A protein has these predicted regions:
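Glycine- and charge-enriched low-complexity intrinsically disordered segments
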Residues: 82-121
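Short, mixed charged/polar active-site loops
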Residues: 74-76, 97
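Short, positionally conserved secondary-structure boundary motifs
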Residues: 1-48, 74, 81, 116-121
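Short coil-to-beta-strand transition motifs
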Residues: 70-74, 108-109
């Protein structure tokens, strides 16, 4: 599976995808690509330097961890939608949620959901 770049676990960072390496992961995960995590907003579950495996899908269930593009930046957060509002919630309580309302929703694209985490590769 291709390791295609990095994703922020904190403040969203510029989204760039280039195949940096290939990694082996369990076929059961049905992952399409992997990203290296930077930051600690998703600690204790996902640590700085972990590799997350992502299954491409345009929608996720409330509470699932998603790779989300916000304009030209990307971040990894728990995704919640309620009506015309989307909230991206960190695992680390030191980080405030990112909230987007009706006028901002066209800036948000779900790239996929986390289906596996690799540590120490």
């Amino acid at each position: 599976m291709p390791l295609v770049g990095s994703i922020a676990c904190g403040t969203p960072i510029l989204a760039e995808q280039n195949i940096e390496a290939r990694i082996g992961v369990p076929a059961l995960w049905q992952a399409d690509f992997a990203l290296t995590c930077h930051g600690n907003s998703m600690a204790a579950m996902i640590q700085d330097g972990d590799i997350v495996c992502i299954r491409k899908q345009p929608e996720v269930e409330n509470g699932e961890i998603a790779a989300v593009r916000i304009g030209e930046e990307a971040t990894l957060k728990r995704f919640y939608r309620q009506g015309d509002t989307v909230m991206l919630q960190a695992e680390n309580p030191a980080f405030s949620p990112l909230v987007y309302t009706r006028d901002q929703l066209n800036e948000i694209t779900i790239e996929g959901r986390v289906v596996g985490i690799c540590r120490g590769i």
